[in-house]
Design a protein with these regions (language model features):
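Class I SAM-dependent methyltransferase Rossmann-like catalytic core
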Residues: 7-32
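C-terminal helical/coil "lid" or tail adjacent to the Rossmann-like core of SAM-dependent
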Residues: 10, 20, 204-259
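Conserved alpha-helix/loop element of class I SAM-dependent methyltransferases that forms part
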Residues: 29-46, 63
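Class I SAM-dependent methyltransferase SAM/SAH-binding core
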Residues: 51, 57-107
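A short acidic, Gly/Pro-enriched loop at the edge of an enzyme's catalytic core
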Residues: 106-117
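A short SAM/SAH-binding and catalytic strip from SAM-dependent methyltransferases
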Residues: 116-131
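A short glycine-rich, Lys/Arg-flanked "PGG" loop and its adjoining helix->strand segment in the class I
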Residues: 131-146
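Conserved catalytic/acceptor-binding region of the Class I
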Residues: 148-216
Length: 276
């Protein structure tokens, strides 16, 4: 059996499988245009051999297939349930366009020096050993190839209107709880160092800002779905007062025309040297 070494397993999703899949679908679409613009700026081109790690249910994979019609996409995902969903979603695409690999990001079983570009979106925050993952992706990249990591940092998560007075404290409590279980919701600030320590050069770091007035409110409703916080409340991670503040924000996002939200992703890129 494959060892996940990760805090994310869809069977443990608080929302349940169907709602979690829908959340991932909306999440993939919200800032895709801005993310793709950055990917191109980092060097992603049509015709490249592309690896997407942590490809999940296939929604980002579908965007890549649509925008890179001459590229071959390898979708690596350790979760069989998620990969089966991706195969159903993308069954109209030829096997000449896409390959599915069920493997760990720590041990991909892929050949050395085989990919022009690797994309790791919202996976590093879950990994017990992010440095090992970055080193494995370094191995499979061609010399001159690039790894782009898109992830979060709850220290600069974003903001909500109406304001949640305890939002930062709530996020820090949840981050600490996740950290004790092997994840890192503050991973964004560490991405340049992870890349440097894995051998990458020409490090770049940027951010992708999402705003409900620009990207739609639906994704933020799902991000702030109060059901996602119930386990943290039940386990004593957040107080009843903090839970109620988040619940009021969730209700406002669903019912108030005055409500809005802004959220931030960190994007880091590193290049494998031409000679090692």
């Amino acid at each position: 059996m494959l060892n996940h070494q990760s805090t994310y397993k869809i069977q443990n999703a608080t929302l349940g499988f169907k709602e979690e899949i829908e959340r991932l679908k909306v999440q993939a679409a919200m800032s895709w245009e801005k993310e793709f613009r950055l990917l191109k700026w980092y060097g992603l081109q049509n015709g490249m051999n592309v690896l997407e790690v942590g490809s999940g249910p296939g929604y980002v994979t579908e965007h890549l297939l649509q925008r890179l019609p001459d590229s071959y996409i390898t979708a690596l995902e350790i979760g069989k349930t998620l990969q089966n969903h991706a195969k159903q979603l993308l069954n109209g695409y030829s096997t000449n366009r896409i390959k599915y690999v069920e493997a760990s990001v720590y041990d991909t079983n892929l050949p050395d020096n085989s990919f022009d570009f690797v994309i790791a979106r919202l996976i590093f925050l879950h990994l017990y050993h992010p440095l090992e993952a970055a080193q494995e992706l370094f191995r499979v990249l061609k010399p001159g190839g690039r790894l782009v990591i898109i992830d979060i940092d709850d220290g600069i998560f974003g903001t909500v209107n109406p304001e949640i007075p305890s939002l930062h404290n709530i996020l820090m409590k949840i981050s600490q709880y996740v950290s004790q279980r092997g994840g890192n919701r503050l991973i964004g600030r560490s991405l340049p160092r992870i890349l440097i320590n894995s051998g990458y050069i020409d490090i770049e770091i940027d951010s992708v800002i999402q705003h409900s007035d620009v990207h739609g409110i639906d994704g933020f409703k799902r991000q702030f779905d109060i059901k996602r916080l119930i386990p943290f409340y039940k386990n004593g991670v957040i107080t009843s007062e903090e839970f109620e503040q988040m619940n009021k924000a969730y209700e406002a996002l669903n019912h108030s025309a005055e409500a809005f939200a802004m959220m931030n992703y960190i994007v880091a890129c590193g290049k494998k040297p031409l000679s090692i």
